[in-house]
Amino acid sequence: MANTSHSSQDQFANKAQAWSARFSEPVSDLVKRYTASVDFDKRMARHDIRGSLAHADMLAAQGIISAQDLADIQRGMQQILSEIDAGSFQWLLDLEDVHLNIEKRLVELVGDAGKRLHTGRSRNDQVATDIRLWLRDEIDTLVDLLRQLRHALATVALENAATIMPGFTHLQVAQPVTFGHHLLAYAEMFGRDAERLADCRRRVNRLPLGAAALAGTSYPIDRERVARTLGFDGVCRNSLDAVSDRDFGIEFCAAGALIMTHISRLSEELVLWMSPRVGFIDLADRFCTGSSIMPQKKNPDVPELARGKTGRVNGHLVALLTLMKGQPLAYNKDNQEDKEGLFDTADTLRDTLTIFADMAGGIKVKADNMRAAALQGFATATDLADYLVKRGLPFRDAHEIVAHAVRDCEQRGCDLADLSLADLQAYHPSIGEDIHQVLTLEGSVAARKHIGGTAPERVREEAQRVLAETAGA
């Protein structure tokens, strides 16, 4: 009798899996742990329930399940949502994933109606739907965070439209720009990032549900109804493609990698600018840390860590590309590995953008240090060359003349603006008394007043444009 009871318990344990009737022995505990995803995919529980409710609504509308079944499913799902919100829902490793955990609890609550929910669908199209629902929400959040970051950058840019700093190429002083102009470069980058995410969302926003395992279903389902209920723009047009590809996730990770690349470039500059050797800015204390041994230290840990996290996001992109490259159609278990990289990419982006929007708005600008740095390195040499061109010289001749002048100034230990009119006319007689205004930092930036230029008036216009674009919804 004891042996029979033990055998029955083993059979019951094996039936924890929805597919267990096909097998003669249960999977090992190690295999359970190895193949289970519930520890990380349970974050999609609300999206899974949304998808299931829309599916149940369609099944009832099509006469595939009864109105009473639908009411029972809705009641059970509301109870499950309440348990999840209260933290009392019991997630079981034996049930593998978020889908089967919720289905098992639903059956416990409403009986056979819960068993009918899975009619006309597979976990293959179910999980693809969950991911798209989740990712759509994440994209909307990230687009708004990019808006906030751009707004913060434009606010500081407007305040510093005329704050002169050196512009660099090869990390060598090149030409004067304004700090506002420099910050607006990042506002442009993050604007394109938002556009990329919005474009990605269009391809995310197609409904896979109804593809079932891979070939569709023989039930008279109405996929368009489900799409409308869940706010999708349409349905995936091929059942094999719907369940097997994750290109929308790869595209999201690629957009995320670009966002983090731009964050990393900004981070590098924040670290450099905050260095005492440069001293262009200071960051608020809440974004910095100290040293356990050196009492004087104020370290820009947030931008440094963001720079490091860029590699993390890039790694998720490569992992997803590698995951997909060798898979035949249709669904393969490999695709279970898509979620952790997607989840971590979204989490990293969300946290990083939230912090940077706050940090950027609190940058303390050290304008005197910026100006002093711009006075070094012959930043207005190009202005002198342009001056000569406007007096009829070919640019290459003007370039050579100014190069000689710069070399002479280096030997004399002075700047071009320090030369007398007579000294300058020795290089070319066309140089007039107006040259010294041309060679000032203010004259240099003011001259670049075309669209996209660094003239303060243009910087103010561009900052105001970005502020208008990013005004709070």
Swiss-Prot record:
Cell location: Cytoplasm
EC number: 4.3.2.1
GO cellular component: cytosol
Catalytic activity: 2-(N(omega)-L-arginino)succinate = fumarate + L-arginine
Keyword Mitochondrion found: no
Gene3D superfamilies referenced in this protein's UniProt entry, alphabetically: Fumarase/aspartase (C-terminal domain), Fumarase/aspartase (Central domain), Fumarase/aspartase (N-terminal domain)
Primary subcellular site in the record, as a coarse category: cytoplasm
GO biological process: arginine biosynthetic process via ornithine; L-arginine biosynthetic process
Pfam family, one: ASL_C2
Keyword list, A-Z: Amino-acid biosynthesis, Arginine biosynthesis, Cytoplasm, Lyase
GO MF annotation terms: argininosuccinate lyase activity
Entry-linked PANTHER family: ARGININOSUCCINATE LYASE
Entry similarity comment: Belongs to the lyase 1 family. Argininosuccinate lyase subfamily.
Protein name: Argininosuccinate lyase
Record organism: Bordetella pertussis (strain Tohama I / ATCC BAA-589 / NCTC 13251)
